[in-house]
Structure formats: structure tokens, C-alpha cells
Amino acid sequence: MRVSCVYATASRWGGPPVASEVRGDAAISTTPDAAPGLAARRRRILFVAEAVTLAHVVRPFALAQSLDPSRYEVHFACDPRYNQLLGPLPFRHHAIHTIPSERFFGNLTQGRFYAMRTLRKYVEADLRVLDEIAPDLVVGDLRISLSVSARLAGIPYIAIANAYWSPYAQRRFPLPDVIWTRLFGVRLVKLLYRLERPLLFALQCMPLNWVRRRHGLSSLGWNLCRIFTDGDHTLYADVPELMPTYDLPANHEYLGPVLWSPAGKPPTWWDSLPTDRPIVYATLGTSGGRNLLQLVLNALAELPVTVIAATAGRSDLKTVPANAFVADYLPGEAAAARSAVVVCNGGSLTTQQALVAGVPVIGVAGNLDQHLNMEAVERAGAGVLLRTERLKSQRVAGAVMQVISRSEYRQAAARLADAFGRDRVGFPQHVENALRLMPENRPRTWLAS
């Protein structure tokens, strides 16, 4: 089974989540997949998503859907801000708090991630959910507090991450869009960043290390990559052909791309698009700048292309050019597959949708995660990286025409599509492997504290 093709179940956009009965013993499921004779024998798996962006919710959501409900009792914990987009949940949902996305992005522009106070509250919330559900295994995506809470609860923990955050990755750290690049320009700040980056990363490691020490756990050191990838097992939602690593330990493995698209009816214009011009799929996702989509649409307005755009519910467009067709959300995999080029924020969710279809990408990258991903795509020859600071329409238009007119971009994207499509160990097997290594009588150390 390949996790590289995980699809959303059929649902209506905006559908309500399935009601669930949450009990501490969690022995009998209230979801339709439950069978009375199977519940006691099924392994209980808890997925925990950090809902600062949609990508970190839909990845564990898609992985949770890949598990056989006759073998696993699945629980899904996340802030409910994206629940309407997910539609009816086929497993139990547990609401936990995630800081507002705007605060998270504001932190990133100031060169920091989470405050110690935030992580302490996260750990407390995690422990309540872990105690309530008593899972056999927990799977987290960017919920770095699980580095503490899962260990205190004695529960095996699988961390989902991108390979460019691996301590074993072969990459450099580019300068992201931060407040200083907007004030002083990229060139000057880049020189200082090369000197100060190790110190900045060390400062960003301090909050989690403080919380770990407070609970009697050892420090993870001053490598930010260890903060984002710490787990009993770490799975990279990437392929080595795009993001190579070296000397991976046995508990770090490639999972392959995890794809997701919102289910539901496409917009009315979906089946009547013009066919005489190349299609450009534009979406800045939930972590792109609110005004960037308008800039992109304006940049493409005079080009001989048809634009299909998804606002992700975040953009208040003042004008929609005549060659553009816009919706809040689109089926991303299908939109990418019918396009000549995809313009996005450079995040892994949309770039993987494009590359799986063999379509090159233009990434308008802002934060470090997006820059790391797009540098890998650009290095592979399958796309172009644009910076968000002082972005001009002419630069966007030039990049689009460059990618459309030069066949080497599509050829490179096709090579990556082949890599993404190769068979590899599927997520259910990784779950089985983690459970097999689980001690029979794991200690619940935090209960005594």
C-alpha cells in the first residue's frame, strides 16, 4: 500500500463533524465503523495535529483515514478551526487548543516559534487527552509538545515531519521573510543571518528544552531540527530524490508524500474552462500572505493563460481578472493535474500535489519551512522560488512564462513524479512496526507527578 496516494473520503464542503461520545475507557466506538466484537481487540491510535496551518491538520487526517477501522480504533485531536473543511469525521474528534494562526505567523516574522508558556499549556492539554483516551500509539504533526507529553505518559510517539527539517538532511538554511528583511532588505540581512543563525536557532530551542527539563527530561540540544523531528519514530513526508539525507538512524524513515484534497462538488465553471490556453493553478494556501493572491492574479491578467485560483477562505479580492476563475477551495490534486504550472506559497502540501502530477511549481515563499521546501524543488529543476518581500507583478509574470516556455521544468517535475510514485513501506506498516516494539507494560510516569 502506498501512502503517496491518500485521498479524502467523499464529503460535503462545510459538513458538520460526526458527533462522538468521549469516554476515558474508549472501549466502544460511536462511529459507524465500530463492531462490538472488534472494539476490545483493536489497537487505539491517537493522531494529534497542530492547526496553525491546514497542512499540519490534513496530513495526520489523511494518514488516520488510511488505517483499517476493523483493526484500529482511531482518535483525532486538533483545534476545530478546520473541521468544516474536513467534513464529517469518520473517527472521534477531541478538541485541543492551538494558538491562533496569525500569532504563529507573527512569531515567525520575528524569528521565533513557541513561547515556553504556550508549550507548558500544550503539554498539560496533551496529557489530559492522553489520559482520557489511553492510546497504544500517538502520531503527531508539528505538535512538538508531544516530545514531552508522550514520554511522560509512556506512550510510543511517531513524529511526522518534512525531510528538510531532518538533522541528517543535506541542505543549507535560507533566509526567510522576517521583519528585518522588510526593513533593511534581503542582501544586508542575509550577511548577518549567516553569522547569527546558529544563535537564533539555539534561542528557538530554549522553550521546549526548558519545558523538558521541568519535567525531568533531557535537553534536545541546540539544533532546531531535533526539536521538529524528535520522536520514538520519525517519518518524513518526502522522498530522498527531492530531499536527500545521510546516515539516517533506523527509527527515521521516508514515508513519501501525503496528499489531501477537500471533497465535494467543484465550482460551476470547473467543466467549462477554456482549452485554448495553458492553465495556471494559483493558491497561496492558509499560510500565504492575504494580499499575495491579488498580486498574482493581477500579474497573470495580461498573459495568454487561464487562471484557476483558490483563496483558502483568506483573501478578500478586490478585482478578478477576466482570465481568472476563483473559488474558496478547489480539489488540489485535480487542479494541479490539469495545469501547466502551479503558483503557491511553496509549502509541501501544494508542491507535492503538483509534483505527483509532474507539474512544475512557482513558490512564493515566506517562512523558513516554505523556503526550505522550495529550495529543494528549485535545486531539482522543477520550479522557481520567489520571495514575498517587495514582490512585483512583473517578477511573477516572468517566472510563469519562463516555466511554461521551457520544457526542462516539466521534465524535472516528471522525474520527481516517478520518484513519488514508487512503492515504499506504507503508513499502516509503520504503525504496526511501532506497536511491535512497544513494551507490554509501559509506565504511566506522569500519573505519579
Curated annotation (Swiss-Prot):
Keyword Glycosyltransferase listed: yes
GO cellular component entries: plasma membrane
UniProt keyword annotations, A-Z: Glycosyltransferase, Transferase
Record flagged with keyword Transferase: yes
InterPro entries from the UniProt entry: EryCIII-like_C, UDP_glucos_trans
Enzyme Commission numbers on file: 2.4.1.-
Pfam families cross-referenced by the UniProt entry: EryCIII-like_C
Gene Ontology MF term list: hexosyltransferase activity; UDP-glycosyltransferase activity
Enzyme class: transferase
GO biological process assignments: glycolipid biosynthetic process
SUPFAM superfamilies: UDP-Glycosyltransferase/glycogen phosphorylase
Family: Belongs to the glycosyltransferase 28 family.
Something else known: Was identified as a high-confidence drug target.
The protein's role, per its UniProt record: Catalyzes the transfer of the first rhamnosyl residue on p-hydroxybenzoic acid or phenolphthiocerol derivatives to form, after O-methylation at position 2 of the sugar unit, mono-O-methyl-glycosyl-p-hydroxybenzoic acid derivative (p-HBAD I) and 2-O-methyl-rhamnosyl-phenolphthiocerol dimycocerosate (also called mycoside B) during p-hydroxybenzoic acid derivatives (p-HBAD) and glycosylated phenolphthiocerol dimycocerosates (PGL) biosynthesis.
Name of this protein: PGL/p-HBAD biosynthesis rhamnosyltransferase
Species: Mycobacterium tuberculosis (strain ATCC 25618 / H37Rv)
Record lineage: Bacteria, Bacillati, Actinomycetota, Actinomycetes, Mycobacteriales
